[in-house]
Amino acid sequence: MANYYTDIPELKFHLNNPMMKRICELKERNYRDKDEFDYAPLDFEDAVDSYDKVLEITGEITGEIIAPNAEGVDEEGPHCANGRVEYASGTKQNLDAMVKAGLNGMTMPRRFGGLNFPITPYTMCAEIVAAADAGFGNIWSLQDCIETLYEFGNADQHSRFIPRVCQGETMSMDLTEPDAGSDLQAVMLKATYSEKDGCWLLNGVKRFITNGDANLHLVLARSEEGTRDGRGLSMFIYDKNEGGVNVRRIENKLGIHGSPTCELVYKNAKAELCGDRKLGLIKYVMALMNGARLGIAAQSVGLSQAAYNEGLAYAKDRKQFGKAIIEFPAVYDMLAIMKGKLDAGRALLYQTSRYVDIYKALDDIARERKLTPEERQEQKKYAKLADSFTPLAKGMNSEYANQNAYDCIQIHGGSGFMMEYACQRIYRDARITSIYEGTTQLQTVAAIRYVTNGSYIATIREFEAIPCSPEMEPLMSRLKKMADKFEASTNAVKEVQDQELLDFTARKLVEMAADIIMCHLLIQDASKSSELFSKSAHVYLNYAEAEVEKHSNFIENFDKEDLAFYKK
């Protein structure tokens, strides 16, 4: 049977990145748990070995249980009866296998029953699961909502809720409403404090809630009467055991059928405040969404891998004109670009997760003791990098998942249009990745300030100073010219000092930055492992160079007066 971890050597390569040493030191507090928990690592090598073993177990479960169940889960889907959700039979088997393997609450401290994993190996598990069944990946990976409760909840909430998630209970984040999608400050679900009940009561409707009948919900609701903006919103914890929330319906979706997307009705649902009032959107949801966006980036990479695998296998097997179609330039060109996007996107994903790991670990340490000046500087540096890289990782990987799924079907030809092949499910599942947890357009909004304030070009120039292998030096020379064009395009737009023009060209500028950053990461990876990444580094740079040139030419020849041609 396939193992979705050991079959992908690129994953182990990223697990062994040099930054992991610092990440483990911070996450393990210099390995202080070893005297209290027999499964805690003794040192860095022991920690990485533990991550490797858990990833192998995840890969095995994914290959032997989740992947074989995927087609049946897609066809059956979840059911809704009497206000409750019942998962597809295959989903139940998947969850049972993951719980028995102890793969829940993975990033939580051991004192709560967690594994105390950094975000990076956990994200690898999420990628692996999504490659087999993206819908199930949603249900399982929503456990990372507990990060927000851990970060902002109180000690009593920690002791009551975190162990339950570590034991396998599921979570959801209830944000969206019929009139509040991307514009979450329009949320109107009402939260009223009841002196009689000694808790908050929630009333209203939530829509498009992934895994909406979960055991524990993080809910965004309006706690401040008379407000209509984000400052009137707070975050609440709703426990399904309390009752008061019913599933009105499960949405009939294009893809991710195994994941129940629900409309929820709250009727005096008892809930408790998480953190402080009025900070629900402006602080807590932003943290929650950044974690979710990293998760969708991982899901997207998993889907890209699945699409590439299906396309490659079919191209090797399918014969036309007396030879396998993989031998035709039109086909091997598509496959090479698919692999280049996959490797580039994965490099960006795990560079981002490592940045998140360092600043999150330092945040956690800061709740225990005062950080040293050096640690505060390190925390600030990696928080900024994580914030700037997260929208790139989510935006680019979700687009690449869709592109790879499209090309996978194209490689299959007419067979790809038939429901008998897995590529149609991958195509349907991938489509949502560039929509939920913030559309690609919203990722651009989040990223553009790092274009205009010089953060991306500063990071790119730092990457240029990193030595590369002799094989990669010609690519690096071309890459520096690409960076010059990006910088010139940025300056050209800024000099006009027109907000509408900046908004209009923002996606092109953000994609230029992302393309160049991913090229750098691939060159760094290929310099360490030519066998794994040299081909993708060459292929992806050829692709990215053409993309940067295209965007550069557009911006150079575009005047703000041209905006009128695009308006109805």
Task: Please annotate each region the language model reported.
Residues 1-81, 85:
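Extended, charge-enriched "interface" segments that sit outside catalytic cores
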Residues 59-60, 90-163, 167, 210-212, ...:
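Internal helix-loop-helix
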Residues 241, 248, 260-292, 309-326, ...:
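A glycine-rich, basic-preceded beta-loop-alpha segment at the flavin cofactor/substrate interface
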Residues 154-160, 439, 445-487:
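A structural-propensity feature for long, helix-poor, extended segments
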Residues 2-5, 9-10, 17-19, 256, ...:
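Alpha-helix capping/hinge segments and adjacent helical runs
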Residues 199, 203-245:
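A short core secondary-structure module
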Residues 343-394, 490-504, 523, 527-531:
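C-terminal helix-coil-helix/basic helical segment that borders enzyme active sites and/or dimer interfaces
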